[in-house]
Amino acid sequence: MKRDALSALGLASHVAARLADRSRARQVREALEAGQLDVHYQPKIELRSQRVSGVEALVRWRHPTRGLLAPAAFLPTDEHDGPMVELTAHVLDVAIGQAAEWRRRGVSLSVAVNISAASVADERLAGTIDALLRRFDVPARQLVLEITETAVLRDPEGCAELLHEIAGAGVSISLDDFGTGQSSLSRLLRLPIHELKLDREFVRAMSAGHDKDRLVHAILTFAHDLGHRVVAEGVEDRAMLDRLADLGCDEAQGYYICRPLPADELPDWVLRPRGAADRLFSRPLGAGAWEKPFRAPAVAWR
């Protein structure tokens, strides 16, 4: 009897989740059609040079009554649901077009775009990206595609083939939320990955004790041995940033560095002079690596 009740409860929860996802998918489609989805950009810094190395494009919904909403508040939890291919194409269009506009203003930054699981399974993705890069005259090296381990799981071989085609054209591939998925390392090694994004849970856990530091150090060593760069996300304070620099992390992003900005605000943030009050790191570290305050005006390629 108890087992039957638990099974019924589990089924009810699953049905409720599916209905919620369908409702969210419908809302996303309506927001797309109404032109209510904007793209904001969160800067990333290269820890050794302390330069702005690029930005991540993050979708926001200008809800007519609830204000500006982050993705967690409106995207379906199942990335294969509804209009995720259309949403990914929209963000790619906006982000690549914005990169071209910034280039005209003297700010050349790599732009990372999150690619939904549905889009990774879409054989049209490579053609869509190529057409957008040509249309806006943006170099392929300026675009980074962020994929998750979960997106790879449904069709590993097909995903690998598509990503090799895209990477062969010069676009960088980033594995997002590394360490949170269930994909085998052997499978990941077959993908043309250029960087790993260290999940924010690993970054936050560093403050919990030395064992967590050793785990992050092991991930960094593993990635660097394979020739991959590592980006830490979710950096919330100076202690986190200092520790990541000590451990040899390549890049970082988070609210401590800068919140996601509307496109028209980003150039001013990147180009404004920085003084002592803007110093992100608490002390010089290593052999001359941190001799100066963080200098955002010096824009660096990945």
Please provide the spans of the model-predicted regions.
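Bacterial c-di-GMP phosphodiesterase EAL domain
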Residues: 2-138, 151, 302
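Surface-exposed amphipathic alpha-helices with a cationic face
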Residues: 99-103, 133-134, 160-168, 217-224, ...
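EAL-family c-di-GMP phosphodiesterase catalytic domain
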Residues: 1-20, 47-48, 64, 116-121, ...
